[in-house]
Swiss-Prot record:
Polar residues: compositionally biased ranges: 290-301, 352-361
Region (Disordered): 176-837
Function as written in the Swiss-Prot or TrEMBL entry: PPIases accelerate the folding of proteins. It catalyzes the cis-trans isomerization of proline imidic peptide bonds in oligopeptides.
Protein name per UniProt: Peptidyl-prolyl cis-trans isomerase CYP95
Biased composition (Acidic residues): 211-228
Membrane-spanning segments: none
Biased composition (Low complexity): 229-239, 380-409, 466-478, 494-513, 536-553, 774-784, 792-827
Organism whose genome encodes this protein: Arabidopsis thaliana
Compartments where found: Nucleus
Pfam families per record: Pro_isomerase
Biased composition (Basic and acidic residues): 176-186, 326-348, 362-375, 429-440, 702-714
Family statement: Belongs to the cyclophilin-type PPIase family.
Keyword Isomerase: yes
UniProt note on tissues of expression: Expressed in leaves, flowers, roots and stems.
Length: 837
């Protein structure tokens, strides 16, 4: 029907070098015939060389140069391959076509109208409905197969449209039954070639294993054992070859005979399996670990063999051979033999970099081939899943006794299947290499820990696996604390949160990290998180800030720059911080309050955050959100900006000017605040004025810029009846009067008046000042500083009274301003202040 009529094209797309996956598009020639034909011809490459560019008019080999997460992907520059050029099949004169379809679905193909003469080969694929493209782009097709690959493409983009990895069009063309047939032919050829490849690979693997066995430290034993091992793979290869011949012959015979031969084959397999384990057990009766690893390896070898046969076709195609299984068998045996000695000799540093690299490369492609052989730490890191196992195994090897306990822990958690086995290995290794305990010191740092963390990151697959092995193995040697910090991987990864975990992990920063280093600092707060961990957390938040970076620099310190520097003190930077408590807040994350977060994010701003974070203030924590903006500002500035820090507030009480009266008044009008709360405002009267001005572009203005008179004039129509009240503060009657009134008055009119008057009052710093002295007891200054209801209103609104309160106490308190404490109301004010600055 329509779909059959419409031409279809395919694109095999590879993301970051992974195996190509196919996307099939249906074109709409009836809607946009010129554009559809252009796209189809560029997919097939049938138009030859472009007259303008001199390049083949073919999408093959070009990249997705722009990937806007949540919007669309753009590709089609086969000239420069970076989005700066393109060419259509119409030689620079692309016929105009008006848009008829809307961008209402995911996976729609469209082309820009404006740039079609210059970039006539560029096309868009939508990730979501996108109305912004409706007027500027012509829809000429849609994705009918390969939505998963489209999602993957979207994941590697960012908000700016820059792909984080390369996304390449490996092949493209017209999609039809012919393509499927050709694929089938290719597969058939592949099958035939597999046999030849297998033979060659077996030879290579046997030679490699021999050479490796020669280099073994236990020369006599290892050589003899390796020879026996090699015999089994060679025997397997020959027997498998014979089987294939038999199959050929049997194919000509009757079914009965075939079934008999099949049975014989199965029996041979069984006998071989039985023999192999015996050999292994014979080989390493000396050490428990060897025997265990041997038996496990043998089982895994059998599994590998079976799996390889079952997946013969697929494996050969992806990895190019099933021999890796045999090769791995030999390696595993060798590793099993030398595992104990290596651990003792190299202190577990030996991570077999080559194997690791190979495994990293292969991991993406053949996770199914590899079985977990805990004993072969490196070999099993192949699959991403195993990355963890790899690092785990490394960790055990690295720090046998010390790390094993923790390592098993994460191992188990990470991959239960592997877990049990690995745990065994770990325990064995523990027994086996007490000598390697030289690393005892590392134990404290417990690489394992880092491993446990890094596994989490293992998602990074490559990086992580590397990081654990590299970072961990290295780090133990280096210095419990610092080594991890170094974690090159981290450095590399530094940017991504996951990375920072890695970092942390290697550091031991994992939740446990604190154990070893946090002990001194993080204990106070959350040892597990520990300063470092907090960092790690913080880094995650600021991946960019890269705690990692800082951590890298300062093993312990770098964590949160500020926090690390002074767990408690870091706060010092900003009032909140200084309060120590504030820091604490931040520390929530970090050992102490490190503020780590806030410092990292913005020494100054963070503060505000930190206040939020203040242990006490944790309530304020919600502010954290705002923190950056209003509250955060205020706190940060708090000290330095006065904005709200009690101390600065004091100093700059003037600024808060209105707040003190406000506070007083608002207090006196407590009814109003209560009324407000009842009304669902969530703020005390204090903030009423703020609320009112909140709509104005800058809250700062009303309090500072307008005098009480101007304010009065401004709102005269509404306030006509309340001027006396405005004056009352000057007379000094205000306090009693207001108090009375607040009690008696309903939140209604008074409330409103009050609100207005309030703002004037506020702006009327003079009265405010006068009263200030009396108010001082009220902690006017703090209140004032905070009183900047404005800012408060700003952040408070979001935060709610609780927040402001919590803040003020923590802030005020931490600053140790009696007034700030005294003015619980002021908290709100304070918040306001913050917003101001």
């Amino acid at each position: 029907m329509a779909k059959k009529k419409n031409p279809q094209v395919f694109m095999d797309v590879s993301i970051d070098g992974d195996p190509a996956e196919t996307m099939v598009f249906e074109l709409f020639p009836e809607v946009a015939p010129k554009t559809s034909e252009n796209f189809r011809a560029l997919c097939t490459g049938e138009k030859g060389i472009g007259p303008r560019s001199g390049k083949p008019l073919h999408y093959k080999g070009s990249f997705f140069h722009r990937i806007m997460k949540g919007s669309s992907a753009q590709a089609g520059d086969f000239v420069n391959r970076n989005g700066t050029a393109g060419e259509s099949i119409y030689a620079g004169k692309f016929p105009d076509e008006s848009p008829k379809l809307r961008h209402e679905e995911t996976g729609l193909l469209s082309m820009s109208i404006a740039d079609r003469d210059k970039f006539g080969s560029h096309f868009h694929i939508t990730f979501r409905p996108n109305q912004q493209l409706d007027r500027n782009n012509v829809v000429f097709g849609k994705l009918i197969q390969g939505k998963e690959i489209l999602k993957k493409i979207e994941r590697v983009g960012d908000e700016e449209g820059k792909p984080t990895v390369s996304v390449k069009i490996i092949r493209c063309g017209e999609y039809s039954g012919d393509k499927k047939k050709s694929d089938g032919k290719k597969n058939g050829k592949h099958k035939k070639s597999l046999r030849v490849r297998r033979k060659k690979r077996r030879r290579h693997s046997s030679s490699e294993s021999e050479s490796s066995s020669d280099s073994e430290t236990d020369s006599s034993e290892s050589d003899s054992e390796s020879d026996s091992d090699l015999s089994s793979p060679s025997f397997l290869s020959s027997s498998s070859h014979e089987r294939q011949k038999k199959r050929k012959r049997s194919s000509k015979k009757d079914k009965h005979r075939r079934s008999k031969q099949r049975d014989k084959r199965h029996e041979k397999k069984r006998s071989m399996r039985d023999k192999r384990p015996k050999r292994k057990s014979r080989r390493s009766p000396d050490s428990l670990e060897d025997s265990n690893s041997g038996s496990e390896a043998s089982l895994s070898d059998v599994n590998v063999e079976i799996g390889a046969k079952k997946r013969k076709h697929r494996v050969s195609r992806r990895t190019g051979n099933s021999a890796p299984a045999v090769e791995k068998e030999a390696e595993s045996l060798h590793q099993g033999k030398r595992k104990g000695p290596d651990l003792l000799e190299n202190r577990g540093l030996r991570s077999n970099g080559i194997s690791d690299a190979a495994s990293e490369q292969i991991s993406d492609r053949q996770p199914d081939i590899v079985d977990d052989h805990p004993s072969k730490s490196r070999s099993r890191s192949l699959s991403p899943k195993r990355t963890v196992s790899k690092s785990t195994s490394v960790s055990p090897r690295r720090s046998q006794s010390k790390s094993p306990s923790s390592s098993p822990r994460w191992n188990g958690g990470r991959s239960p299947a592997k877990g049990s086995r690995q745990v065994k290995n770990l325990t064995n290794s523990r027994r086996e290499s007490p000598g390697s305990e030289e690393k005892g010191r590392h134990v404290r740092r417990s690489p394992t820990k880092s491993v446990s963390r890094s596994p989490v990151r293992v998602k990074k697959e490559r990086d992580i696996s590397r990081s654990p092995s590299k970072s961990l193995s290295r780090s133990p040697l280096r210095s419990p604390k610092r080594v991890i910090s170094r974690s090159p991987v981290r450095g590399r990864i530094a940017r991504s949160p996951s990375r920072s975990p890695v970092r942390s992990a290697s550091r031991g920063s994992l939740g446990r990290g604190p154990l070893r280093r946090s002990s001194r600092r993080s204990p106070s707060r959350s040892p597990v998180r520990s300063s470092r961990r907090s960092l790690s957390r913080s880094p995650i938040q600021l991946s960019r800030r890269s705690l990692s970076r800082s951590p890298t620099r300062l093993s312990r310190r770098s964590l949160s720059r500020s926090p690390i520097r002074s767990p408690r003190k870091s706060v010092s930077r900003s009032p909140v911080r200084s309060s120590r408590k504030s820091v604490s807040r931040s520390p929530v994350r970090s050992s102490r309050r490190r503020i780590s977060r806030s410092p990292v994010r913005s020494s100054r701003k963070s503060v505000s955050r930190s206040p939020i974070r203040l242990s006490r203030r944790s309530i304020s924590r919600s502010p954290i959100r705002l923190s950056r903006r209003s509250i955060s500002r205020s706190p940060v500035r708090g000290r330095r900006r006065i904005s709200r820090s009690p101390v600065p507030a004091r100093r700059r009480s003037v600024r808060p000017r209105s707040p003190p009266p406000d506070r007083r008044r608002s207090l006196s009008r407590s009814a109003s605040p209560n009324g407000r709360i009842r009304r669902g405002r969530g703020f005390s009267q204090r903030f009423s004025y703020a609320r009112r001005y909140r709509t104005s572009p800058s809250p700062d203005r009303s309090p500072y810029r307008f005098s009480d008179r101007s304010d009065r004039d401004r709102f005269r129509s509404r306030r006509r009846f309340s001027p006396s009240r405005f004056r009352s503060p000057l007379r000094g009657r205000t306090p009693p009067r207001y108090r009375r009134r607040s009690r008696s008055v309903s939140p209604g009119l008074c409330y409103r008046n009050r609100r207005y008057s309030r703002s004037p009052i506020r702006s009327r710093s003079p009265p405010y000042r006068k009263r200030r002295s009396p108010s001082a007891s009220h902690s006017l200054s703090p209140s004032r500083s905070r009183s900047r209801s404005k800012s408060y209103s700003k952040s408070p609104i979001g935060t709610g009274k609780a927040r402001s309160v919590s803040r003020s106490p923590s802030k005020a308190r931490s600053p140790s301003k009696s007034d700030s404490t005294s003015s619980d109301n002021s908290p709100g004010g304070k918040k306001g202040l913050v917003a101001y600055d």
